[in-house]
Amino acid sequence: MNPEIFAKELAKYGFELNEKQKKQFATYYDKLVEFNKKVNLTRITDKNEVYLKHFFDSITPLLEFPDLFKGEKTLCDVGAGAGFPSLPIKILCPNLSITIVDSLGKRLKFLDELVNDLGLDKVTLVHSRAEDAGQNKDLREKFDLVTGRAVARMSVLSEYCLPLAKVGGYLVALKGPKAQDELAEAKHAIDVLGGKVEDVKELTLPDTDDDRTLIVVEKIKATPKKYPRQAGTPNKKPL
């Protein structure tokens, strides 16, 4: 998917990229490849692959559930790595306020430089484990949307993310193919943490056989204070 096809695909969903946005994605790609030589951010560096498997893939929640992103929403991206999915979404939705939580300082250095180079405002970077962020009173139950992509299986991801969503907010999980088994396994965790599965959308990336699953979980009640448990526990002993 070259930049021109990327723009055409987005236009099918009513998102017409302006010149500034096209330039932001081009800068994002250049910066990602340049920084990746020093810090391992991604194994995908081919331009067409980055536009498809990072940029377009990150934007799929916005394309499939546009109403979730309307207005002056707050979004927390847990374990964003090289900024996925939140920063591609931010380029298309400048009104979003983004908070990125990541535990690796080197990745945050990249993100800090990237946000500056892209000229993005309302982006906050937090150096923290997800479990600690969920117990931080400045972050807990503060966000309209919480995203997670390639972070952990659904039961673990729910414990990382749902404590950060406000009641009435949503967790949007970007998953690979056949996520239904993972979701069934996570049903208890989602319930305990105050969530309810609102929607599951299966899709295929354009002109590929790459299947993806988007899982939307609504936060319907407050998360019990004991969750998330201390760092490392959710992954070792999933709910």
Curated annotation (Swiss-Prot):
GO MF annotation, one: rRNA (guanine-N7-)-methyltransferase activity
This enzyme's EC code(s): 2.1.1.-
Top-rank taxon: Bacteria
Enzyme class: transferase
Signal peptide from the UniProt entry: none
Binding site for S-adenosyl-L-methionine: 79, 84, 130-131, 149
Compartments (UniProt record): Cytoplasm
SUPFAM superfamilies per the UniProt record, alphabetical: S-adenosyl-L-methionine-dependent methyltransferases
Keywords: Cytoplasm, Methyltransferase, rRNA processing, S-adenosyl-L-methionine, Transferase
InterPro entries: rRNA_ssu_MeTfrase_G (IPR003682), SAM-dependent_MTases_sf (IPR029063)
Keyword Transcription: no
Keyword Transport (UniProt): no
GO annotation, cellular component aspect: cytosol
Protein family membership: Belongs to the methyltransferase superfamily. RNA methyltransferase RsmG family.
Function text: Specifically methylates the N7 position of a guanine in 16S rRNA.
Listed name of the protein: Ribosomal RNA small subunit methyltransferase G
Source lineage: Bacteria, Bacillati, Bacillota, Bacilli, Lactobacillales
